[in-house]
Curated annotation (Swiss-Prot):
It catalyses: L-glutamate(out) = L-glutamate(in); L-glutamine(out) = L-glutamine(in); L-alanine(in) = L-alanine(out); L-serine(in) = L-serine(out). The modification Phosphothreonine is found at T772. Residues 439-454, 466-475, 493-508, 544-559, 645-659, 668-679, 731-752, 763-773, 802-811, 863-876, 976-998, 1035-1044, 1057-1068 have a biased composition (Basic and acidic residues). It is found in: Membrane. This is Solute carrier family 38 member 10. The chain crosses the membrane at residues 4-24, 36-58, 84-104, 120-140, 153-173, 229-249, 272-292, 323-343, 345-365, 378-398. The modification Phosphoserine is found at S612, S802, S890, S966, S999. Belongs to the amino acid/polyamine transporter 2 family. Its main location: membrane. It is a multi-pass membrane protein. The gene is SLC38A10. Keywords: Amino-acid transport, Membrane, Phosphoprotein, Transmembrane, Transmembrane helix, Transport.
Length: 1121
């Protein structure tokens, strides 16, 4: 399994990407419903069932040889099974899309409403969903080929999920993961939530649609490999889900809502997480819509074929494509607007379509194909149970939503912004109430400490209480928890209303004024509901420590003061707390008790009745919750009423408190208030300091995080720039190497295009290769030349020419055709890049035509014959090019090719002097202008095309030319520059008469133009030499490299022999051919001289090479023919 995981990690990552989705947001909610232990066990069980169902599909596919889910169903149960699978798949993906919309509405509406200053509500949520679907989802979904980008987006979504998990873990640490407070607040096993959570768990692992595509993508498909891949993937996902569920539940306990992200306090990190998560979900829509659309198309429009199978879903008509996309996008959008919470849609979808696709269908298919399978029976019955019971349970719970989840949905989701603002208000109120208390204390006389004890819980500032230290600790803990406290508040506690933002101070002041008459004051039902934590247990006066805790907590949560009073006064009111509605079937009070109990030990230095202790614990916990709950718990998302209560900010309780204490403010209460406020001022100052410290710490952390992010971003930018530079350098180096390598292999091994221009990089290697080739017999060259197309491969010089032709789009078009005579098609491809050449070619065409006339008169050696046919083809295809550069040369080559075939060596010699004499003379005047133009823009291959046309046409015309041309164009462009300098040198050297050395050196830069031309010039001699070895070399041609090496040596020798002839005879043509490249640097007269010298040099090196190549080409010509 490990080996498979290591070798198939890419597949595992893709599967994890496809499994993990929005359902991860509901994991803490499911853990709250089932308890930590039972939730984890159910996750493991669902993971095992998913693995079994995937293996059912793989085994069935291996036996039936089917490779699609629907195909397996059709194989097992016919059209009915196929229809069931397709319908279930469509429903599953539609449900997932609706869940996506719900999450976007939850996360986006609050953020954007706060950003633009709108009121969060149903209207804004609808507008947001419509805008997202119209601007993001629809454009992406209308793309036919988005899978590559979609996969990158899905990877981005996975990144957000990972960040989300770490945020959850940090949140749990902040909420006292190691303090142990959560131990009594959480539940471990709750059987009543099993059937509501199993469908969500089952759907959260849904990956059956990815099984068969993954199976097909394996190099060696096997059941064992698939088992290991999916086992690894499911293990990763299970671990991820358990961590998110556990830490999320510990962080928010009973306040946990369906979408955990709703609980986090508003800060830069959490807002970025929300927005990023929302955008990743929006961009992930096409992942669901693409397969859904395809399934709909096949279900509605697919026709059964004669053989009983169905055509694989292929191209979809545009109209149907758009219609299905629009219907899916906007249909699911309406569903997202109508369904308020994500756990409901995920539960319904998972219970129906999810159970069918994930468990029932795979088990049925496997059971039909494998007669006896116990595991399939288990999975089948569990799936059926989920389908029936979970559907009923989910629907029944959704009916109760008005009391419970309904409040969470509208209050926690639609009114999340308000809830968050209330949370912030609660935090501020914790400080503001303290200030208010201080003000009230100023106006009122201090009361005895007895009153303080009773009222301290309300006042938030315990004064002179022996338990103060404990209270301080509790306050500090509460404050620490405050930012994201989210301590689970039982549904009953939802009735605890945090003070309304605007009324925080006023409420607190009035409450304090009215606090004194707590005895006279009737316990508010809200207070009782808060007391629910006590569960109807009467709360005797809380110990000072508890009161201190309550006071700071109440001070922080403006609501707490009145509530604490209500609790103290309602210590006799166990009924109200009991009355508190239970959240998700759990009595709100119990969690409160559990939460309070852990803290009670520390808070109650004095032993008290169990009820009093529980009440104290509840009060403390509530205080802590108030501190921490303000953001999440009181956000109204935590409890059924929180939305409304939080909306009022605890106004309902406050009014009750106000009237009760308002009944009459005895002087004692005022004095007590003064005393309490004195202590309250201290407590308030302490709370404020603690709060400020927390805020400062938080601000510092945020600042540090921002700075780190900025630094990281800068580093990343720098790295990206460096990478870009490095990539560019690598590309340049790689291109150069490729050019060099391509030149080498093409010149040595393929020599495909004798007339094709060779890139500089290639020319240089060709020069070396030629040297080596000169050392070796030329025979291997023929095989090489033939290697590319089976035809005699063009010589390196020819290749260079062809390469140069692309380089000199203008002047080398003509050269290209002669070289590409046989490779007419390649030339066609080359013709496009040479369009520029064609433009410039017309001028050269005239000169070339003249040269052609001379060349026509000149017989060309046998290689010309071979090349002649292809040249003719090229001339026909590229009349302008062939005529311009090699028009004459190619024609001459064709003629000499024929003549050489007839006359042999004699024709080659005649061709040589004809080419050198008339061809050169004809070419010189015309070639000079051509050379000027070509040298200015490109390396000149015109003469090379004309003279070397005979030998080169064959190789050039052959397929190798294509390669050479492509390379030649790249290398030719570089070669042109080199050619200019090289040609100047060559001209000088040519003038000096050093054709051989110059040709070799210039082969790097001039070989493109110069070498091919010399080939033509020595063609007579080469033709003779090649005529004899040409026939033999073709036989030996296939030991290309060895023969090439030998040929290289022979070529050098031949070049030396031919050098003078080439110089004398080919001088004019050399001028024409080589002059093209050097023309820019040389004047017309100088150009001729330089061209002559260059041609001679090129002839010296190229002609020798051409001999071997021509000889090889000669045998290749018959092959071509």
């Amino acid at each position: 399994m490990t080996a498979a995981a290591a070798s198939n990690w890419g597949l595992i990552t893709n599967i994890v990407n496809s499994i993990v989705g929005v359902s991860v947001l509901t994991m803490p909610f499911c853990f709250k419903q089932c308890g930590i232990v039972l939730g984890a066990l159910l996750l493991v069980f669902c993971s095992w069932m998913t693995h079994q169902s995937c293996m059912f599909l793989v085994k069935s596919a291996s036996l039936s040889k089917r490779r699609t889910y629907a195909g397996l169903a059709f194989h097992a149960y016919g059209k009915a099974g196929k229809m069931l699978v397709e319908t279930s798949m469509i429903g599953l993906m539609l449900g997932t899309c609706i869940a996506f919309y719900v999450v976007i509405g939850d996360l986006g509406s609050n953020f954007f409403a706060r950003l633009f200053g709108f009121q969060v509500g149903g209207t804004f949520r609808m507008f947001l969903l419509f805008a997202v679907s119209l601007c993001i989802v629809l454009p992406l979904s209308l793309q036919r080929n988005m899978m590559a980008s979609i996969q990158s987006f899905s990877a981005m979504a996975l990144l957000f999920y990972t960040v989300f998990m770490f945020v959850i873990v940090l949140s749990s640490l902040k909420h006292g993961l190691f303090s142990g407070q959560w131990l009594r607040r959480v539940s471990y096993v709750r059987w009543e939530g099993v059937f509501r959570c199993i469908p969500i768990f089952g759907m959260s692992f849904a990956c059956q649609s990815q099984v068969l595509p993954t199976y097909d993508s394996l190099d060696e498909p096997s059941v064992k490999t698939m088992s290991s891949i999916f086992a690894s993937s499911l293990n990763v996902v299970t671990t991820f889900y358990v961590m998110v569920g556990f830490f999320g539940y510990v962080s928010f306990t009973e306040a946990t809502a369906g979408n955990v992200l709703m609980h986090f306090p508003s800060n830069l990190v959490t807002e970025m997480l929300r927005v990023g998560f929302m955008m990743s979900v929006a961009v992930g829509f096409p992942m669901m819509i693409l397969p859904c659309r395809q399934a709909l198309s096949t279900l509605l429009c697919e026709q059964q074929q004669k053989d009983g199978t169905f055509a694989a879903g292929g191209y979809m008509p545009p109209l149907r494509f758009k219609a299905l996309t629009l219907s899916v996008v906007f249909g699911t959008m309406v569903g997202g607007i109508l369904i308020p919470n994500v756990e409901t849609i995920l539960g319904l979808t998972g219970a129906t379509m999810g159970s069918l696709i994930c468990f029932i269908c795979p088990a049925l298919i496997y059971k039909k194909i494998h007669k006896n399978a116990l595991s399939s029976q288990v999975v089948l019955w569990v799936g059926l149970g989920i389908l029936v019971v979970s559907t009923v349970t989910t629907l029944s719970v959704s009916e109760d939503v008005p009391e419970d989840l309904a409040e969470e949905a509208p209050g926690g989701r639609l009114g999340e912004a308000e809830g968050l603002m209330k949370v912030e208000a609660a935090r501020l109120s914790a400080q503001d109430p303290v200030v208010a208390v201080a003000e009230d204390g100023r106006e009122k006389p201090k009361l005895p400490k007895e009153r303080e004890e009773l009222e301290q819980a309300q006042i938030k500032g315990p004064v002179d209480v022996p338990g103060r230290e404990d209270g301080k600790e509790a306050q500090e803990e509460a404050q620490l928890d405050r930012p994201g406290q989210g301590i689970a508040v039982p549904v009953g506690e939802a009735h605890r209303h945090e003070p309304p933002v605007p009324h925080d101070k006023v409420v607190v002041d009035e409450g304090q004024d009215q606090e004194v008459p707590e005895e006279n004051k009737p316990p508010s039902r809200h207070a009782g509901r808060k007391a629910p934590g006590v569960q109807g247990q009467m709360a005797p006066p809380l110990p000072d420590s508890e009161r201190e805790k309550r006071e700071p907590e109440q001070g922080e949560v403006g609501k707490r003061p009145g509530q604490a009073q209500a609790l103290e006064e309602a210590g006799d009111l166990p009924e109200d707390p009991q009355k508190v509605p239970e959240a998700d079937g759990q009595p709100a009070v119990q969690p409160a008790k559990e939460d309070l109990e852990p803290g009670d030990g520390g808070l109650h230095p004095r032993p008290q009745a169990v009820l009093s202790e529980q009440q104290n614990g509840l009060a403390v916990d509530e205080g802590e919750k108030a501190e921490g709950v303000p953001p999440p718990g009181n956000a109204a998302g935590d409890t059924g009423q929180p939305a409304e209560d939080s909306d009022h900010g605890g106004k309902p309780p406050l009014p009750e408190e106000k009237p009760a204490p308002g009944a009459g403010l005895p002087p004692e209460p005022r004095e007590q208030r003064d005393v309490e406020r004195a202590g309250g001022d201290q407590a308030a100052s302490q709370l404020e300091e603690a709060g400020r410290a927390e805020m400062l710490d938080h601000a510092v952390l945020l600042q540090v995080i921002k700075e780190q992010q900025v630094q990281q971003k800068r580093l990343l930018d720098q790295q990206e720039k460096l990478l870009a530079v490095i990539e560019e350098q690598h590309k340049e180096i790689h291109q150069q190497r490729q050019e060099d390598e391509e030149d080498k292999p093409r010149q040595v091994e393929v020599h495909p295009e004798p007339g094709a221009a060779v890139p500089r990089g290639q020319e240089a290697p060709e020069g070396k290769a030629r040297e080596t080739m000169e050392n070796l017999p030329p025979l291997p060259l023929d095989p090489v030349l033939r290697a590319p197309g089976g035809r005699p491969a063009p010589s390196q010089d020819l290749n260079q020419r062809s390469l140069e032709h692309p380089e000199r789009p203008v002047g080398r078009d003509p050269a290209g055709p002669p070289d590409g005579g046989p490779d007419t098609e390649p030339r066609a491809a080359q013709a496009k890049p040479r369009d520029g050449q064609k433009d410039a070619a017309p001028g050269a065409a005239g000169t070339v035509k003249e040269l052609l006339k001379g060349l026509e008169q000149v017989p060309v050696p046998d290689p010309a014959r071979e090349a002649g046919g292809p040249e003719e083809r090229l001339a026909e295809e590229f009349p302008g090019q062939s005529q311009d550069v090699t028009g004459g040369g190619s024609q001459d080559r064709k003629k000499p090719g024929k003549e050489v075939a007839a006359t042999g060596t004699g024709i080659l010699k005649e061709a040589n002097w004809l080419v050198a004499g008339p061809g050169a003379e004809m070419g010189d005047p015309h070639m000079k202008p051509k050379q000027m133009s070509r040298d200015l823009g490109l390396a000149v291959d015109l003469p090379g095309g004309a003279e070397g046309a005979a030998a080169q046409p064959q190789a050039v015309l052959r397929q190798p030319e294509l390669r050479v041309i492509s390379d030649g164009e790249q290398g030719g462009q570089q070669g042109h520059r080199l050619d200019h300098g090289g040609y100047l040198e060559m001209r000088k050297e040519a003038r000096g008469g050093d054709h051989m050395p110059v040709s070799h050196e210039q082969l790097g830069g001039e070989e493109d133009a110069a070498v091919p031309e010399p080939r033509q010039r020595p063609e007579p001699e080469l033709g003779l030499k090649q005529a004899v070895p040409g026939g033999q070399r073709p036989d030996n041609a296939k030991p290309n490299r060895d023969l090439k090496l030998q040929a290289g040596s022979d070529l050098r020798r031949r070049r030396r022999d031919l050098g003078p002839h080439a110089e004398g005879e080919l001088a004019p043509r050399d001028r024409v051919i080589i002059g093209l490249n050097p023309l820019p640097d040389v004047q017309v007269n100088d150009l001729r001289g330089a061209l002559d010298a260059q041609l001679r040099q090129a002839a010296g090196g190229a002609l020798q090479v051409v001999h071997s190549r021509q000889l090889r080409q000669a045998p290749g010509a018959p092959e071509e023919s």
